[in-house]
Swiss-Prot record:
Known EC number: 2.7.1.30
Coiled coil, from the record: none
UniProt name for this protein: Glycerol kinase
Alphabetical GO biological process terms: glycerol catabolic process; glycerol metabolic process; glycerol-3-phosphate metabolic process
Activity-regulation annotation: Activated by phosphorylation and inhibited by fructose 1,6-bisphosphate (FBP).
Catalytic reaction annotation: glycerol + ATP = sn-glycerol 3-phosphate + ADP + H(+)
Origin: domain of life: Bacteria
Broad enzyme group: transferase
Residue numbers bearing the Phosphohistidine modification: H232
Length: 502
């Protein structure tokens, strides 16, 4: 009797690594998760130990096997999805990182980004990469490491150092250095990749003085990149055949294959992506133009709005302010709040993302009175996530010249019913929550399975992930607009405060 075959997805996130085993129906068979250390060397800096990330991935692969009883030789293929932009530079010969991984959230390279802006490169970078010049993307992070690690520039020029985002690092480790590759979706987030010409941009590399020899080969999102070295996969030699940055993987996992489809993942940050099809649309309103995915010889573009603080605002309530013991508790407190929504929290802890791109803004609270309770504060924090999503959806509709009818949602905070209902109310459109909230991992699994024939085609995938629950708007128009107007005032005041000179 032939053994049943499965697909494993490795989901390497900002705060934890996970391995999930899926069956042919797209159902989760088992999963394992491990958190790792967040390193904050200075205010606004965020780093990870890349070796610790690799160890956590090894650990969760084992955990998924142990929990399910599935053996390594039953895994047909592996899909990888990852926190994007986070930057690793390592020694080609020893495999050891020369510095910590600089995380997407980290602002330590903001002065470099400002310097590029002041040199007049904003338009050039936008046209080539689809991105706004910001410390968020990998380009300035690579430059920072080459500047701050002694001898790094020289070694990079000699071809002794390699650069990669987390996907590249994991494939390199899993294949024992046999494959130094990335995919379209991750390359598009480096600010070094020309998304129109689909190649590393020589002019940008020259401006930043980043040696091309460091860069990985860019491949499609669904093909075999290499096989696991048996000693790194518990004896199994398994093809790694699907790869996408976490948000693009979620777009694919949400089956948003048609132009105009939009998804939002409520994770650490919140990321809204619209599939715009095979045409690259440059945003005129500070959204990012990026690559959604490339499969079967075609590349599908996307518009994206990035919110830096979403689920992490709830973590802040839990860990920083100790107002809740766990994240789900925030829903109960929000429902117990009886104020008139006059409190606004602007969680600009690491600046404001799209459409403001204000890296100097910091968190603020408005509208407090003597009667404000803990419940009100928690509710306002949840509402801030929904308001930020509205900022982006409004902008996206202008850029894409289309009305969005429904927003597909997933991610941890999408489990919060209060937040989902308020999101529907403040947007005035339906919110469709995926039945399987593991859409990021599922997207990576789908991409891996397609390339080895585990699933036949997109039509077969369409039968695998249904909508779980629909939230319909119930707030009247004038109330909705009054609340949103208050939010816009709060953001304006937050930005003004950051601009006041000492």
């Amino acid at each position: 009797m032939s053994q049943e075959k499965y697909i494993m997805a490795i989901d390497q996130g900002t705060t934890s690594s996970r391995a999930i085993i899926f069956n042919k129906k797209g159902e989760k068979v088992s999963s394992s998760q491990k958190e790792f250390t967040q390193i904050f060397p200075q205010a606004g800096w965020v780093e990870h130990n890349a070796n610790e990330i690799w160890n956590s991935v090894q650990s969760v692969i084992a955990g998924a096997f142990i929990e399910s009883g599935v053996k390594p030789n039953q895994i047909e293929a592996i899909g990888i999805t990852n926190q994007r932009e986070t930057t690793v530079v390592w020694d080609k010969n020893t495999g050891l990182p020369i510095y910590n991984a600089i995380v997407w959230q980290s602002r330590q390279t903001a002065p470099l980004a400002e310097q590029l802006k002041s040199q007049g490169y904003v338009e050039k970078f936008h046209e080539k990469t689809g991105l706004i010049i910001d410390a968020y993307f990998s380009a300035t992070k690579v430059r920072w490491i080459l500047d701050h690690v002694e001898g790094a520039q020289e070694r990079a020029e000699k071809g002794e150092l390699l650069f990669g985002t987390i996907d590249t690092w994991l494939v390199w480790k899993l294949t024992d250095g046999a494959a130094h590759v990335t995919d379209y979706s991750n390359a598009a987030r480096t600010m070094l990749y020309n998304i129109k010409e689909l190649k590393w941009d020589d002019e940008i590399l020259e401006i930043l003085n980043i040696p091309k020899a460091m860069l990985p080969e860019v491949r499609s999102n669904s093909e075999i990149y290499g096989k696991t070295a048996p000693f790194h996969f518990y004896g199994g030699e398994v093809p790694i055949s699907g790869m996408a940055g976490d948000q693009q993987a979620a777009l694919f996992g949400q089956l948003a294959f048609e132009p105009g489809m939009v998804k939002n993942t409520y994770g650490t940050g919140s990321f809204i992506i619209m599939n715009t099809g095979e045409e690259m649309q440059l945003s005129e309103n500070n959204l990012l133009t990026t690559i959604g995915y490339g499969i079967n010889g075609k590349v599908y573009y996307a518009l994206e709005g990035s919110i830096f603080i979403a689920g992490s605002a709830i973590q802040w309530l839990r860990d920083g302010l100790r107002m809740v013991e766990n994240s789900p508790e925030s829903e109960k407190y929000a429902l117990d709040s009886h104020n008139n929504d006059e409190v606004y929290v602007v969680p600009a802890f690491t600046g404001l993302g799209a459409p403001y791109w204000d890296q100097n803004a910091r968190g603020s609270v408005f509208g407090l009175t003597r009667g404000t309770s803990k419940e009100d504060f928690i509710k306002a924090t949840l509402q801030s996530i929904a308001y930020q999503v509205r900022d982006i959806i409004d902008t996206m509709q202008v850029d894409a010249k289309t009305a969005i009818q429904v927003l597909k949602v997933d991610g941890g905070a999408a489990m919060n019913n209060f937040l989902m209902q308020f999101q529907a109310d403040i947007l005035g459109i339906d919110i469709a929550r995926a039945k399987n909230l593991e859409t990021t991992a599922l997207g990576a699994a789908f991409l891996a399975g397609l390339s080895v024939g585990y699933w036949k085609d997109l039509d077969e995938l369409r039968t695998l992930n249904e909508t779980g629950e629909l939230f319909e708007p119930s707030m009247n128009e004038s109330r909705k607009e009054q609340l949103y107007k208050g939010w816009k005032k709060a953001v304006k005041a937050t930005q003004a405060f950051a601009e006041i000179d000492d």
